[in-house]
């Protein structure tokens, strides 16, 4: 069997230890590497001629991308996972204990266990490549750094900075890492190895104190100050997680124990907490999302069909969505885009939108002004169909008006080539209806983005019955180039995400009309795990947008989608939400705290009564979403529970720690869910009637993920 580690002794007394996992594009750490590494370290220790060690990767753009997450699934118990952590501790302690200098030479991803390996070295040097990123992102999988990261990072960069890194999972670029003191030098890739060798030859340096500001020194230098840091971190974590994610609190505890009781105790606590987290429901759910998205990246969306190249794009409409789509096409996909709008003002807005996003990148030093200008040069504008004959894809982002979209289809087919794909960003109109105006319906597809485009990761790729596999595969590949996570869904009103969201929002509106207060409703759903509450979401999306979609869904899907009377009353008072400064909340106020616009209750003709139990309020909204998600699976709107889970998490912020609607239903049990729906059906009517698939599953005891 090929080895993952090789040792090369140089004439100057430096040994270069190269990690290159056979058959993999990136290095990941695995439990079975432990004996191999220990064997290498013993060999180094026994050779008096070795004056220093450089650890480097044999992969092109990856130092070590982290631990192999799949090995955690083999842990049957928390104790199994603790043993993995302890094994890592032993290996890294053996490395750290070498009496000769050990230097990590880092190029590319240095994440998770990879950074913990680097932290166990005596010095670190990294390249200035854009692909070099350093971080401990374990919290995003519901875990904590289990290889000593919670102990070595605070000692190197300070308590506050290390907590910020570990609690957010943020990844640092080379210059940020240097400024923080995480690495000792940043050099071009061409001299990385030579620099690391010179550092090792220079001999061990005395341990450096963390680079701390005056305030950080005052706080971290005393027990009282350190206590303030930990208590403040706990307070912020609880506010953000609502108690739904156990990992952040355990990270804080590991650091606290290590700082107050020493590294031996800290490592013991780290292993203990790591084991508990590995077998927690939250981490299992978050890891399932990781594996699902990794799997989806390998799929074309159309079987074995390969996508065609997209070298030029046109966007119809310079509004908020059009500007956002054009922006991610140039900045992420690096594809030239031409924006068409009937108004010069619309075109100016689209350019300004893109420039504003790029300017943020310059301000944060993620790019130079020259790179910004080159990316802006990829975007051109027009009020006519000019310069688009060779466009490979046209993305339509105009109003939800079927006649207007029909005109767009005809115009594009007249002005563009026969190969050009027409992708509509409609949020509710069936693609089949849009394609009725097309001479080449096989080129027509839905490409539903979510707002704001540059932030929301999901896109729905909607194929009607005549869309060709080639069009699907090309559109999926294009969306991935834009940095999106695409799910392919079948055509139908509301598609998947808006369809399950509509019933959730309608139920929240019903609760409002029953006398629940706006902020109490929002807090109940945020406590459940959503990033924002339904009333806030309505204000952000636009109350008018919700009101337009509801009749379409009701017409196509039936009475259960009938919108509550609240929408008409709000629009009659010109309340559209944040966009016009009038909605459920106050806008333009100087107060940092978001305040309810109390006049909304008068508009709706109600007086808020006693606040209901938050869990009960959340349940009533969420079971509607769950029931409809199963209907979508039943009807083939989504291809699998996996796609349904990813769509809900990335499209509307369904609580990730629950794993998505389908994993959550498995944890509840179909029998329990059907009983809950029937109870609400008795109280509120047939909009809560459980769908056939759920009833069958309740009777058979089956699950979505067997």
UniProtKB/Swiss-Prot annotation:
Catalysed reactions, semicolon-separated: a (3S)-3-hydroxyacyl-CoA = a (2E)-enoyl-CoA + H2O; a 4-saturated-(3S)-3-hydroxyacyl-CoA = a (3E)-enoyl-CoA + H2O; a (3S)-3-hydroxyacyl-CoA + NAD(+) = a 3-oxoacyl-CoA + NADH + H(+); (3S)-3-hydroxybutanoyl-CoA = (3R)-3-hydroxybutanoyl-CoA
Molecular function as annotated in GO: 3-hydroxybutyryl-CoA epimerase activity; enoyl-CoA hydratase activity; long-chain-3-hydroxyacyl-CoA dehydrogenase activity; NAD+ binding
Protein name, per record: Fatty acid oxidation complex subunit alpha
Subcellular location: Cytoplasm
Residues with site note (Important for catalytic activity): 116, 138
Chain segments carrying region Enoyl-CoA hydratase: 1-188
Metabolic or biological pathway, per its Swiss-Prot or TrEMBL entry: Lipid metabolism; fatty acid beta-oxidation
Keyword flag Coiled coil: no
Subunit field text: Heterotetramer of two alpha chains (FadJ) and two beta chains (FadI).
Biological process annotations from GO: fatty acid beta-oxidation
Region listing for 3-hydroxyacyl-CoA dehydrogenase, in residue ranges: 308-706
InterPro entries listed in its UniProt record: 3-OHacyl-CoA_DH_NAD-bd, 3HC_DH_C, 6-PGluconate_DH-like_C_sf, ClpP/crotonase-like_dom_sf, Enoyl-CoA_hydra/iso, FA_oxidation_alpha_subunit, FadJ, NAD(P)-bd_dom_sf
GO CC entries: cytoplasm
Entry keyword Cytoplasm: yes
Disulfide cysteine pairs (residue numbers): none
Function of the protein: Catalyzes the formation of a hydroxyacyl-CoA by addition of water on enoyl-CoA. Also exhibits 3-hydroxyacyl-CoA epimerase and 3-hydroxyacyl-CoA dehydrogenase activities.
A Pfam family of this chain: 3HCDH_N
Family according to the record: In the N-terminal section; belongs to the enoyl-CoA hydratase/isomerase family. In the central section; belongs to the 3-hydroxyacyl-CoA dehydrogenase family.
E.C. number: 4.2.1.17, 5.1.2.3, 1.1.1.35
Main localisation: cytoplasm
Species this protein is from: Shewanella loihica (strain ATCC BAA-1088 / PV-4)
Keywords associated with the record: Cytoplasm, Fatty acid metabolism, Isomerase, Lipid degradation, Lipid metabolism, Lyase, Multifunctional enzyme, NAD, Oxidoreductase
């Amino acid at each position: 069997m090929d080895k993952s580690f090789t040792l090369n002794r140089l004439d100057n007394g430096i040994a270069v230890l190269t990690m290159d996992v056979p058959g993999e594009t990136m290095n990941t750490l695995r439990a079975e590497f432990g004996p191999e590494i220990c064997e290498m370290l013993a060999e180094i220790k026994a050779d008096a001629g070795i004056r220093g060690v450089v650890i480097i990767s044999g992969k092109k753009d990856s130092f070590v991308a982290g631990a192999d997450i799949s090995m955690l699934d083999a842990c049957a118990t928390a104790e199994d996972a603790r043993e993995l952590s302890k094994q890592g501790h032993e290996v890294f302690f053996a490395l750290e204990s070498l009496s000769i200098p050990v230097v990590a030479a880092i190029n590319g991803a240095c994440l998770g266990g990879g950074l913990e390996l680097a932290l166990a070295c005596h010095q670190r040097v990294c390249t200035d490549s854009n692909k070099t990123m350093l971080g401990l992102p374990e919290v995003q999988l519901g875990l904590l750094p289990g290889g000593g990261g919670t102990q070595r990072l605070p000692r190197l960069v300070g308590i506050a900075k290390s907590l910020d890194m570990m609690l957010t999972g943020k990844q640092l670029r080379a210059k940020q890492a240097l400024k923080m003191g995480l690495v000792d030098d940043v050099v071009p890739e061409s001299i990385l190895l030579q620099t690391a060798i010179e550092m090792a030859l220079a001999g061990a340096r005395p341990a450096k104190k963390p680079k701390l500001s005056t305030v950080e020194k005052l706080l971290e230098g005393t027990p009282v100050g350190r206590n303030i840091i930990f208590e403040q971190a706990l307070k912020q974590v609880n506010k953000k997680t609502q108690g739904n994610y156990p990992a952040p609190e355990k990270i804080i505890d590991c650091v606290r124990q290590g700082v107050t009781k020493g590294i031996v105790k800290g490592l013991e606590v780290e292993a203990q907490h790591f084991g508990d987290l590995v077998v927690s429901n939250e981490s299992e759910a978050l890891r399932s999302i990781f594996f699902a998205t990794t799997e989806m990246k390998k799929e074309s969306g159309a079987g074995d069909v390969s996508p065609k190249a997209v070298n030029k794009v046109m966007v119809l409409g310079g509004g908020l969505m059009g500007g956002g789509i054009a922006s991610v096409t140039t900045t992420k996909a690096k594809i030239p885009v031409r924006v068409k709008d009937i108004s010069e003002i619309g075109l100016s807005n689209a350019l300004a939108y893109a420039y504003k996003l790029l300017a943020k990148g310059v301000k944060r030093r993620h790019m130079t002004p020259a790179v910004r200008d080159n990316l802006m040069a990829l975007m051109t504008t027009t009020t006519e169909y000019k310069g688009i004959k060779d466009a490979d894809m046209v993305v339509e982002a105009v109003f939800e008006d079927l006649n207007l979209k029909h005109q767009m289809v005809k115009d594009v087919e007249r002005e563009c080539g026969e190969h050009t794909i027409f992708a509509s960003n409609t949020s509710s109109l069936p693609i089949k209806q849009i394609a009725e105006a097309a001479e080449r319906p096989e080129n027509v597809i839905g490409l539903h983005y979510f707002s704001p485009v540059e932030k929301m990761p999901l896109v729905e790729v909607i194929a009607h019955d005549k869309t060709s596999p080639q069009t699907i595969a090309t559109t999926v590949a294009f969306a991935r180039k834009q940095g999106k996570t695409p799910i392919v869904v079948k055509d139908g009103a509301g598609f998947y995400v808006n369809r399950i969201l509509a019933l959730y929002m309608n139920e929240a509106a019903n609760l409002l009309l029953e006398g629940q207060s706006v902020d109490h409703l929002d807090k109940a759903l945020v406590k459940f795990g959503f990033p924002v509450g339904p009333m806030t979401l309505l204000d952000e999306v636009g109350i008018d947008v919700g009101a337009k979609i509801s009749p379409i869904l009701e017409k196509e899907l039936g009475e259960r989608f009938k919108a509550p009377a609240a929408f008409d009353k709000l629009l009659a008072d010109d309340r559209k939400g944040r966009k016009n400064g009038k909605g459920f909340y106050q806008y333009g106020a100087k107060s940092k705290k978001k305040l309810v616009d109390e006049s909304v209750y008068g508009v709706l003709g109600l007086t808020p009564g006693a606040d209901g139990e938050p869990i009960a309020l959340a349940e009533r909204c969420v079971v509607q979403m769950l029931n409809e998600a199963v209907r979508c699976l039943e009807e083939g709107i989504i291809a699998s529970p996996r796609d349904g889970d990813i769509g809900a998490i990335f499209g509307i912020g369904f609580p990730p720690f629950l794993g998505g609607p389908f994993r959550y239903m498995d944890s509840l049990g179909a029998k329990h869910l059907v009983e809950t729906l029937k109870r609400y059906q008795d109280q509120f009517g047939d909009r809560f009637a459980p769908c056939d698939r759920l009833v069958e599953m309740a009777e058979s005891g089956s699950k979505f993920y067997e």
